[in-house]
Amino acid sequence: MSKNIFTELSDAMASAAEQAGNSTVLVDARRRFPASGIAFAKDMILTADHVVERDEDIKVILGDGTELTARLAGRDPGTDLAVLKLDSASAVPAVVAKTPARVGQFVLAIGRPSKRGIESSFGTVNAIGGPVRTGRGGMLESFIKTDVVSYPGFSGGPLINGEGQVFGINTSGFGSGGAITIPADAAWKVAETLAKHGKIKRGYLGIRSQTVNIPEDGQSQLKRKQENGLLIVGLEAESPAGNGGLMVGDILVGVAGEAIEHHDELFTRLSGDVVGKSTPLDVLRGGRLEVVNVVVGER
């Protein structure tokens, strides 16, 4: 007798949990309550920043039960992410999903909150959104919202698809009304930067601005469909924007070729590699599109 669809689904999700469990670790870096983490390299663990309370002598237990010592390699409270460096390159790196999560997909949240092994929670993707302020001073370009139950110790563990591939990293550091996951592509970028530099650079221009509709004559000059921009209403003294040539009355519509329509998008774009570098800003000035190169300051 052939298996019914529910048995097949159940078996598939159990296999997915087992596969992801190989890369899901226990992270003991705070008093009383261990948490979870994801191996993104053989010697690197990605976890949630809020579960890391010390820099040294961090205990990590791998999927095969091996207990290792780790140290904090970098952290970014703004995105609630931290990277740990293992004293041995023994971890099994996680496999990231090739396609992003979609609303309605079945997912599993995986955690390793104790030495007993992995735990899982089943649910569906409720929404894909962003940008979103994390409540910890940072900004994410996107997030995944699910109805999985995030049990104690699940923070830092993966959200996976039916093949055991990682959609993102679970965090309880921000969000309400459902479990929040940081998408894998965004999390891995942060992780790679933290592993290299120990922190995430965040930039600023030193402007005061408000969202406005772009006039029709301005829209006709853009090579993309864009309705809004940021009207500059003030400049800080000796600000990067002022020193670079931006003026009150300019409408900022792009940073390094990427459209800017709202303050949250500007916050997101002014981070990482652009900080400290001359960056082209697209502005509408007197109805004409101009490019102004500004050296982005560091907060």
Go through the PLM ranges and name each one.
Residues M1-A17, P113, V166-E227, H263, ...:
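C-terminal cap/linker of serine protease catalytic domains
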Residues K3-I5, G21-E119, P152, G175, ...:
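Conserved active-site neighborhood of the chymotrypsin/trypsin-like protease fold
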Residues G21-S23, A82, L86-P93, E119-G177, ...:
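Active-site region of chymotrypsin-like
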Residues K42, A73-R75, I128, G162, ...:
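Residue-level recognition of beta-strand microenvironments
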Residues K42-L46, F167, A241-D264:
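Conserved PDZ fold ligand-binding element
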Residues A73-T79, I128-I144, T193-K201, V212-G229:
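Gly/Ser-enriched beta-turn/beta-hairpin loop segments
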Residues G153-L159, I214-K223, E236-G254, R269:
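PDZ/PDZ-like domain micro-motif
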